[in-house]
Amino acid sequence: MEKNYYALAYYYFGPVSNPHEEIALHKQLFKTMDVSCRIYISEEGINGQFSGYQPDAERYMAWLKQRPDFASIKFKIHHIEENIFPRVTVKYRKELVALGCSVDTTKQGKHISPEEWHEKLQENRCLVLDVRNNYEWKIGHFENAVLPDIETFREFPDYADRLAKEHDPAKTPVMMYCTGGIRCELYSALLLEKGFKEVYQLDGGVIAYGLKMGTGKWRGKLFVFDDRMAMPIDEADPNVSPIARCSLCNTDSDTYYNCANTDCNNLFICCESCIATHKGCCSEECSQAPRIRAFSAERGNKPFRRKHLCPTIEQSCCLKEQENQPA
């Protein structure tokens, strides 16, 4: 019988008195649980992505809300069948979102609920801004959204400068969204610094919108930073039509893989036929490379980890290189 698991997404922007103590307490708690996670904590808050066996997930949520610094945290919950991270990772990270510049987060955009967001989308009065990376919005986004061609979070400040030149900040209302809401905490503050007067941010991000409104005005799937890679935003509506195309044959597809060629590891969209033909690789050239990790349809599109280099160390194509390394 399969276990029931929860996927949790949550964050808190606010002072944390002793982040290193919180990290140690998290690690101690997780020793007795069937969980996996990627959690970052600093003096400015916490950014968490977590999966765990349902009773353990419920125990963790109750425990975290009892911690003085995190009592106001809101969890976004999805039902899953297994853990979706390779391990338990709880780390200190000075920047919860790697923006690359300082921003006054005491001045933020107006948080609006999924219901308010949906109404404003129907009004069609605001510039709807997707503040995620280009590989994220490629497989899913809101209707009529502006889609910045950026590859990392750190590129957004320069994009904000261009946006302020292309649109009159005093007269252009902006509605921004991201996956779970945390990036908008910084990006909305940045747009306000650039002179935009009317900035709204989707409270809880696309995840919260999907949980509350279903598919609504969303098209495609939501990119996520875990073993699922992508998910429909509405659990009740899993059969979502792809809006992207296979990078090899251009047929409709929304499945991401990372290239089986160890020396490439490129993130790319591919259909079932092409991924099988190219042995999990992003190109014919990569499929002929010397260091290819074992790919099979059964493993699906889960990201490769270091342990996937070869089935056994004796078969490792880089073993000879390792033996020649100086001690």
From Swiss-Prot:
Source superkingdom: Bacteria
Catalytic activity annotation: uridine(34) in tRNA + AH2 + O2 = 5-hydroxyuridine(34) in tRNA + A + H2O
Keywords from the UniProt entry: Oxidoreductase, tRNA processing
Active site: 178
InterPro entries assigned to the protein according to its UniProt record, in alphabetical order: Rhodanese-like_dom (IPR001763), Rhodanese-like_dom_sf (IPR036873), Rhodanese_C (IPR022111), TrhO (IPR020936), TRHO_N (IPR040503)
GO BP field: tRNA modification
Domain Rhodanese: 122-218
GO molecular function, one term: oxidoreductase activity, acting on paired donors, with incorporation or reduction of molecular oxygen
The EC number(s) this enzyme carries: 1.14.-.-
Stored Pfam families: Rhodanese, Rhodanese_C, UPF0176_N
Known function: Catalyzes oxygen-dependent 5-hydroxyuridine (ho5U) modification at position 34 in tRNAs.
Protein family per UniProt: Belongs to the TrhO family.
NCBIfam families xref list: PRK00142.1-2, PRK00142.1-3
Entry protein name: tRNA uridine(34) hydroxylase
UniProt organism field: Chlamydia trachomatis serovar D (strain ATCC VR-885 / DSM 19411 / UW-3/Cx)
Gene: trhO
